[in-house]
């Protein structure tokens, strides 16, 4: 595989919507990715939180290959076994009652908005359809989920947008109370704002919002697209907050590398969705569900205990590094804020040069390693980061320009 040829072909035929690194990844195993030139990278991105079991986990590969060789797709006009098995496992893990499968986080959040509005219109009439989200939130790039996203930077040039959305600052309960007038049907929030800088919400604030929503019968939607499926050390981030929302959305790490999203809801909401009220041609695809089943079957108590241990080790190590002001997030969803003068994008580029793949979120470095990482993997990542910070490599290496 020729690196220059791959990049040139991509530039010629792929829509230029991504600022890519000049790395062509060719294969991966466990925590390690290898590029077309044979260079190895310790991956602390997991495909933006997707490869929860790392690259080519044996149980995942077998499950996907066996299902692909048996039945790859049917549409939802017929029953298949994998989607029902997966839905049952998700309901048992979340304490909710019904699942709708789609293909992505954006599709899951779009479905959650539809389900919330259907419940509210059926119960209170068409005047009650407002969805309240938080400033600095990110819920997707379809028009409805883009509108739900509380960041103007994503909104430029794509209007007009759907109506009946409102944004309030995270942590400002008075602002939420004011926005939640008679037209409000749902509050939608991420418990850790990923694209918003890897910032966890305050637990007292979350508890107030949950109690308020219950009192007013405003549905509470928790976007767990990035936080869910073990990322924070529990199956749902909701568990850290003792939170029981009406709707939870999942995606990213659920499929272990295959595209799948899920809208998970309680019976109160589910009973309003009837045949024809929502759909997805590929939703519940047997191969994707087989991959997700392998993820959930692997993610037992011992697995989650390791996530918590590695998260504690990583966070303690990061806090001791030079130039680190703050370590934010929850579990293995980690944000790193730096001293003034150090740019996260330059740190990311320096780490990549030294064989460590990391991400950015606003002004912060973001770490989303596969959940299978070991103590040795954490130490290796910390050593690379220490070199980048202490050696000031991050200030000397220029990031490649985005396409």
Report the location of each language-model feature:
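Catalytic PLP-binding core of fold-type I/II PLP enzymes
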Residues: 199-233
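Conserved small/polar residues in nucleotide/adenosyl-binding loops
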Residues: 397-403
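Glycine-rich loop-to-alpha-helix module at the N-terminal edge of alpha/beta enzyme cores
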Residues: 40-126
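Conserved C-terminal alpha-helix-loop-beta "cap" of PLP-dependent enzymes
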Residues: 333-383
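Active-site PLP attachment segment
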Residues: 234, 242-272, 284-289
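Conserved PLP-dependent catalytic core of the aminotransferase class-I/II
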Residues: 300-354
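Active-site-adjacent loop/helix segments that line or gate small-molecule/cofactor pockets in enzymes
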Residues: 1-29
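PLP-dependent aspartate aminotransferase-fold enzymes
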Residues: 87-186
């Amino acid at each position: 595989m020729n690196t220059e040829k791959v990049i040139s072909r991509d530039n010629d035929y792929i829509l230029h919507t991504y600022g890519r690194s000049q790395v062509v990844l060719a294969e991966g195993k466990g925590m390690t990715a290898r590029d077309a030139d044979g260079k190895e990278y310790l991956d602390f991105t997991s495909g933006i939180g997707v490869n929860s079991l790392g690259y080519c986990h044996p149980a995942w590969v077998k499950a996907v290959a066996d299902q692909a060789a048996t039945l790859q797709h049917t549409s939802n006009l017929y029953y298949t076994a994998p989607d029902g098995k997966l839905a049952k496992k998700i309901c048992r893990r979340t304490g909710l009652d019904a699942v709708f499968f789609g293909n992505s986080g954006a599709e899951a959040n779009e479905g959650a908005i539809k389900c919330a509005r259907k419940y509210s219109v059926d119960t209170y009439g068409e005047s009650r359809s407002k969805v309240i989200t938080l400033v600095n939130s990110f819920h997707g790039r379809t028009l409805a989920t883009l509108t739900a996203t509380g960041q103007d930077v994503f909104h430029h040039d794509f209007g007009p947008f759907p109506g009946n959305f409102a944004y309030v600052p995270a942590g400002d309960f008075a602002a939420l109370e004011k926005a939640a007038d008679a037209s409000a049907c749902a509050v939608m929030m991420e418990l850790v704002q990923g694209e918003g800088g890897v910032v966890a919400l305050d637990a007292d604030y979350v508890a107030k919002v949950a109690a308020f929503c219950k009192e007013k019968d405003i549905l509470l939607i928790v976007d767990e697209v990035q936080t869910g499926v073990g990322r924070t050390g529990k199956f749902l981030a909701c568990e850290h907050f003792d939170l029981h929302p009406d709707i939870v959305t999942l995606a990213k790490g659920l499929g272990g590398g295959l595209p799948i999203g899920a809208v998970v809801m309680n019976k109160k909401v589910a009973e309003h969705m009837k045949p024809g009220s929502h759909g997805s041609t590929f939703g519940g695809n047997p191969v994707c569900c087989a991959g997700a089943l392998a993820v959930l079957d692997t993610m037992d108590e011992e697995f989650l205990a390791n996530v918590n241990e590695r998260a504690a080790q990583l966070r303690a190590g990061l806090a001791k590094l030079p130039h680190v002001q703050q370590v934010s997030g929850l579990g293995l969803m980690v944000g790193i804020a730096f001293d003034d003068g150090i740019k996260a994008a330059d740190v990311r580029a320096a780490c990549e040069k030294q064989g460590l793949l990391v991400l950015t979120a606003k002004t912060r470095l973001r770490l989303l390693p596969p959940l299978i990482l070991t103590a040795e993997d954490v130490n290796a990542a910390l050593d690379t980061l220490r070199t980048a910070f202490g050696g000031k490599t991050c200030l000397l290496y220029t990031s490649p320009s985005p396409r």
